């Protein structure tokens, strides 16, 4: 029913922790059975969005094979671990509105890459496991 779907979308949008995401998925499974990949994708996007905001990412944009993450807080010092894990794929730009970008490789999921990068930033680990 439409009211149930709207409520589910509201619950997904309110996700703030991994535990919240698990609770929402469990509830959806109890009510409707195994959720389609699109619903799992919404849960994943919601969790990554919240985690990114907590570590100082103000906006995320995908342009072609580039993920662009805007932040006034995250700089080269905080990107060390990201640059080690993804060598030759990270570019930092401090001119104008500061951002860093990552190249998405052929066949790679932009969402998985984004999740992996965001969880490497300082503060992400303590925030997502609650």
Where do the protein language model's features map onto the residues?
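Accessory helical-bundle/CTD segments and flexible terminal tails appended to RecA-like ATPase motors
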Residues: 1-130
